Amino acid sequence: MSLRVTAVLTAVLAAASVGVAVAEEPAAPASATAIRAYHDSGEWAKDFTTAFKLANKDLDKALTVKKGKKKPKGTPTLILDIDDTSLSSYDCAAKKDFIPGSNGICAVTENLPAIKGALDLAKKAVKKKVKLVFITARPENETIRAFTEKNLKVAGYTMKHTLTMKPSGVAAETSAAYKTAARKALIKGGARIVLNVGDQQSDLSGGAAQYAVKLPNPMYVNK
């Protein structure tokens, strides 16, 4: 299977080529000033739109069986990260001036709003009989699991899904290692991961997905 990790600066680069002034995504972790400028300029939203348009196209391609070809084996599965992929911590973190760790605090203390592109993608996938799996680096414990499930539901993710959280036994592992292992376990269990979407490179590294799309996030880096 081919893996395509997509940078989401297409709109930015296209605009720059015709002399339009734009705010490019600053390298993470960026300063509070740079993060706000990127957000308030509207470019962050535009880059999200570009990424999710591609994600939708990739999903359609992955589910299309060409004439004369056999349907691929395995349960078609969509993988979504949660924080700043499915739910946005921006408003909450902004109130804390984006201090290091603020997004993580927000994730387990606030009901975060849905990122529309992700919610729409999830609804579309489920409608097409694709299994939805959230893989998050949020730590696995009863309290945080219940809080996360409630937040997802309140934000609009009411469809059937599986939530995979980081077990305490692998707490020292990087997010990349944990998430790669989680995807491989799904495949071993019969899944065919058609699309993987995340805001961190660690959400996508390790492959095991037919298509992968990376969203912009200048606020922090998870390895």
Give the predicted meaning of each segment.
Residues 52-66, 86, 90-94, 125-129, ...:
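Sec/Tat-exported extracytoplasmic proteins
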Residues 24-33, 40-46, 139-223:
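C-terminal cap/substrate-recognition subdomain and adjoining C-terminal extension
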Residues 2-80:
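Non-catalytic pre-domain segments flanking phosphatase-related domains
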Residues 77-81, 86-89, 131-136, 161-165, ...:
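Structural recognition of the beta-strand scaffold that forms the well-ordered cores
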Residues 46-49, 53, 108-116, 173-177:
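Conserved phosphate-coordination/catalytic loops
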Residues 105-133, 140-141, 145-146:
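Short, acidic loop-to-helix structural element flanking the phosphoryl-transfer center
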Residues 64-71, 116, 120, 127, ...:
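Surface-exposed, polar/charged faces of alpha-helical domains
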Residues 87-114:
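Metal-dependent phosphoesterase signature
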